[in-house]
Amino acid sequence: MAEEYVPVDPINITPASSKSWLDVDLDTYIASLPPNVTGVAIRVLNASSGGCPAGVRKDGSTDARTTNVTSGQMCFFCGVSSSKIFEIYSGSTTYITAYIVGYFKDVTFLTNATDVSSAKAGVWNDLDSGYNNAIGLILETNIASLKSFDFGFRKNGSTDNRTERGVRRCGCFIIGADAGVSEQYISSTDQDTYLVGYITENATFYTNATDISLGSTGSYADLSVGSASAKANLIEVVASSTYDFGLRRNGASDDLYEGAAKHACILVGADSSGVSEGKIANTVVDFFLLGYFLAAAGAVALAGQIATKSGLAAGTS
């Protein structure tokens, strides 16, 4: 089988209880999943004005990164078990909402993430995953304290220099790699990075990201296309202040519109022409196209939401 990312329009999986790890079964929410599903993409929104605990992990993992996530929205990526189960943690049923926005087939996810934190602050450093065949790395940021630090990720050899502040944890990033090597920047060694998984095919990662920022506010507008064949677009969100933004498949009706976490990475579905839409509350919110995901050879590219099962909640592990 071949690696592939399959986007879906958002499916609400907000936990009904808080402060414990809960099992989520993908088969409960998405019909007719193939047996080679290995991971999931989750959009997490924190509507509080401050931090709130949240986290996701592969079923069976002992990882327990549940420190406060930033106010705003972000993406998390994690593996699923052979039964297509992952686990989610929420510190609040009032402020935290979570949505499945896609799943991965045959992509490698680690049961327990590997610490790939940098020992040097204030400079760009190589981040060697140890997987020479990787063209993209799936990384999770983690700040153990309630402080804010500048950080950034880029493909090895890039001259990009986006090191906007991360206010507490900012979810996961997917970044291009050259023979398994990316680069990271931190302003403090209190900022940790964990390797969650890696990608080897059917994705394109730019060496230098393309600026696809919007010039108008308040309504959804088409974003510049990286490829008409793209099934999903990988977008880095950078903002000098906290303003709302939304990203969705072109033609979709969902409206996950929440504050920019100053620095986030969103994997968003595209229509049959590779187009996604964005909305911003202020032009200080910028979008950068890091790359895009393609259908596996012989696969049928579907624009729009696949068959889902609605009205169901996550169960307690």
Task: Mark where each language-model region is.
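Short, surface-exposed beta-strand/strand-loop-strand elements in extracellular ectodomains
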Residues: 47-64, 144-161, 240-255
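Surface-exposed ligand/attachment interfaces on beta-rich extracellular proteins
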Residues: 8-36, 48-49, 111-132, 206-229, ...
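Edge beta-strands of jelly-roll/beta-sandwich modules across compartments, strongly enriched
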Residues: 51-54, 93-103, 188-199, 282-293
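Beta-sandwich interaction modules
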Residues: 68-82, 164-178, 258-271, 309
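Surface-exposed loop/edge segments in extracytoplasmic proteins
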Residues: 6, 60-68, 110-112, 158-165, ...
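A short beta-strand element within beta-rich, extracytoplasmic domains
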Residues: 35-47, 133-144, 230-239, 317
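Extracellular polysaccharide-targeting segments
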Residues: 101-111, 197-212, 293-297
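Noncatalytic modules at the cell exterior or secretory-pathway interfaces
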Residues: 40, 78-94, 137, 174-190, ...
